Amino acid sequence: MVETKFKRNAGILMPVSSLPSPYGIGTFGKDAYDFVAFVKECNHKYWQVLPLGPTTYGDSPYQSYSAFAGNPYFVDLDMLIEEGFLLKSEVIARDWGDGVVPVNVSEDDAINGRFGTYRDGNIGDDRYVSYEKVYNNRFDILRIAYNRFKAACIESKKTLAKGLPLYKQFDNFVKDNADWLEDYALFMALKSYFNNVSWGEWETDIKFRKPEAMRHYEEQLSDDIGYWKFIQFEFYRQWTALKKYANDNGIEIIGDIPIYMGYDSVDVWANQGEFQLDENLTPIKVAGVPPDAFSDAGQKWGNPLYDYEKMEANDFSWWRKRMKASARLYDVIRIDHFIGIVKYYTIPADMPDARQGEYRQGPGQKLLDAINESIGDKKIIAEDLGVEVPEVAKILKDNGYPGMKVLEFAFGGDRKNPHLPYNYTQNLVCYGGTHDNETLLGFFENRGDWELGYAYDYLDTRDKIGRASCRERV
């Protein structure tokens, strides 16, 4: 048994996308720094974020184009304005989803908050993200920033941190991250070139990564490739500064990584031999979970499954790189659907649902040994919710990983419910709710009288329920 790396403490789960922002979605800007200050003021230790990768259709952070790249939506536009790559007036002239857009605003008025005349668009709600409007505007505005960035590099007049010339900082970033950035930037440029269809529908030669086709598109799409590299340069620079600020204030960042990649991702396209694909590069088996009390058909997620035999033959090289990259981004790494490392559910890709699936043994400790070697002293949280797999408890104990409990699940059963705090064992992380739950306020607004009564009696309070539930978690 390995001793846990955690000490008793508390934190807050706050998706970056949910931070306040005038530009449609939360970013790494001022409000993120204010949130760090809030976490510190609460005497908490941790800020947990959802996966930071670029999202695909459906906008779920658990379906990403890359295990290594960052979400362009989180690049703060005000910081780009400060750097001289954007004008305030051209940023606020976009409809980011609240339905109110200034028109005919000078740059001076924009900077000083004097917006003058407004027009009403399709009235939105600033409590929610309008992903359609963010998508339609964010990439265009980042393209403007990229063009000014290129001009600044050519002129070699602008400098950033420590006086290092801008082009040199960018070149260093590209060089240091070449093992994933080159494929990612080409992949995204190709996505745009082929009208955003899945890579499985691209022209045959580039789909199969034939060397001549790779060279052809690298040359033809060189400017687009530079654009996608620039976005990652800004993402990583802004996130690194924010994380340093958090760490300097005693706050650690808990990151979240999905166990599986989506089929339409650069990781599958660039590592075709390490996934269960047929000769046409179509998934043979896909991920999901079996039928249970909540679903007669189970859940067919559709993610291509890893070919763990080939991965092991390569010393789990992709996993090592992935976890090493995650260790640079985060102080603690939460692995979603951790059970899948020990035992995974496999479904024939041509089946309509998960009823025809079966369990297969995962790599277990072999993969975890590679992960532990890759992340050094960084900590791991294992999301072990759902189907109980006896082998998981031993794996967690052997590695010192804490599992999870969810307080919102605690009051719907009897006294043996494992999510009730008095049934907790040592070395676990208790969440009020996860990204799959409603908010704590929503929980108390939407539960029936019996479940609420149980919660009130257990927490011994009715008028300060939020504070009491937080007390139980810590």
Q: Which residue stretches match the model-derived regions?
A:
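Alpha-amylase-like alpha-glycosidases and glucanotransferases acting on alpha-linked glucans and related
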Residues: 2-8, 15, 21, 59-232, ...
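Conserved, well-ordered alpha-helix/loop/beta-strand core segments that scaffold catalytic motifs
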Residues: 228-261
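N-terminal catalytic cores of NTP/NDP-binding nucleotidyl/phosphoryl-transfer enzymes
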Residues: 11, 15-36
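Surface-exposed amphipathic alpha-helices with a cationic face
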Residues: 40, 239-247, 372, 396-397
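Outer-envelope exported proteins of Gram-negative bacteria
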Residues: 50, 252-254, 258, 332, ...
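Catalytic domains of carbohydrate-active enzymes, especially glycoside hydrolases
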Residues: 5, 30-55, 329-330
